[in-house]
């Protein structure tokens, strides 16, 4: 493995660890039975770590149902070969979503109540490498 390729792999692993450590994740065994169907229909996304499937808690409402805005965001992001790319998009601050009255970018997962802004940010992201 080349040094550059190894460096990218280490960076990816560090990013995954950061996303897992800083987020609230629930295991496939603690989510509703419909979760596989929801994921297949593009209503939610899941990631795999250490042989287990995990789902970001922010995708669900208080009754453990998928938030409709997640489906819209995933549709705008388009098909991704790597679910960790989707997780990273939700997790890290996005230049197209800023705090009200300020210019500091915020993470899409923290702006899900700002429907138009997060869906627009997903639309703008599609086909790019970042915000």
Which sequence ranges carry the predicted segments?
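Non-transmembrane "mature" sequence context
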Residues: 1-131
């Amino acid at each position: 493995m080349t040094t550059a390729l190894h460096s990218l792999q280490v960076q990816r692993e560090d990013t995954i660890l950061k996303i897992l450590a800083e987020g609230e994740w629930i295991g496939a065994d603690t989510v509703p039975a419909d979760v596989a169907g929801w994921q297949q229909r593009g209503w939610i996304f899941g990631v795999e770590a250490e042989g287990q499937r995990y789902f970001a808690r922010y995708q669900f409402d208080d009754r453990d149902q998928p938030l409709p805005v997640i489906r819209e965001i995933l549709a705008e992001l388009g098909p991704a070969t790597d679910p960790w790319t989707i997780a990273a998009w939700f997790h890290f601050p996005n230049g197209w979503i800023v705090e009200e009255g300020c210019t500091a970018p915020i993470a899409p997962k923290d702006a899900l109540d700002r429907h138009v802004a997060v869906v627009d940010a997903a639309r703008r992201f599609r086909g790019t490498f970042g915000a």
